[in-house]
């Protein structure tokens, strides 16, 4: 966390002493522990089971599984052959050897973090990143690198009544 977020609880109170709703980009055990240490009532935070559900469904592998079900053999949609879920360095190197440049993605990351772009093989730095990611998260997503025309992210808010599209970033 940045220095300005040292005391989260100070930022969670409105002038009239009402508590603000906590809506992080992503929940995890570290954030939950931090909020509890800042005095947030644990009963207002996700349970351990909910955190595990969030972690499982936040992994890129889950998104890839959903994507493959939505694909429906439509030639306008990028098919599953443009990427692999690699469990070791050899699989990563073989994919890059076959496809040239690639994008390496850690299974649990967002907002541009956990992404590396490689061309013509892995550098020693890339290999170290892959080993650490494989060790901590179990896999590395390896995708063919396409020419980027425009980058954006779609933002959604999930709640008990469904999912709302918020906008683009």
Whereabouts are the PLM-identified features?
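Generic beta-sheet signal
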Residues: 20-22, 102-104, 140
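An acidic- and aromatic-residue-enriched active-site/binding cleft used to recognize and process polar
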Residues: 27-29, 107-109, 121, 145-147, ...
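Intrinsically disordered, low-complexity boundary segments flanking structured domains
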Residues: 68-71, 91, 102-104, 126-132
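Alpha-helix C-terminal capping segments
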Residues: 92-99, 118, 133-134
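Phosphate-binding site of ATP-dependent enzymes
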Residues: 100, 125-169
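Glycine-rich phosphate-binding loop of ATP-grasp-fold ATP-dependent ligases
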Residues: 81-83, 101-129, 151-153
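Residues at the C-termini of beta-strands that transition into short coil/loop
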Residues: 46, 119, 169
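Conserved N-proximal alpha/beta basic substrate-recognition cap immediately N-terminal to
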Residues: 2-98, 110
């Amino acid at each position: 966390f940045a220095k300005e977020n040292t005391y989260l609880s100070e930022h969670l109170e409105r002038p009239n002493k009402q508590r603000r709703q906590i809506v992080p980009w992503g929940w995890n055990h570290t954030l939950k522990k931090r909020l509890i240490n800042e005095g947030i009532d644990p009963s207002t935070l996700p349970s351990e089971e909910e955190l595990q559900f969030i972690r499982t469904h936040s992994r890129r592998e889950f998104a890839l599984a959903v994507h493959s079900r939505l694909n429906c053999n439509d030639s306008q949609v990028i098919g599953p052959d443009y990427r692999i879920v690699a469990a070791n360095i050899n699989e990563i190197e073989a994919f890059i050897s076959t496809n040239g440049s690639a994008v390496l993605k850690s299974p649990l990351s967002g907002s541009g973090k956990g992404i590396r772009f490689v061309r013509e093989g892995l550098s020693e730095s890339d290999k170290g990143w892959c080993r650490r990611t494989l060790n901590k998260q179990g896999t590395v997503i390896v995708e063919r690198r396409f020419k980027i025309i425009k980058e954006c992210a779609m933002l959604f808010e999930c709640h008990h009544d469904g999912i709302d599209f918020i906008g683009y970033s």
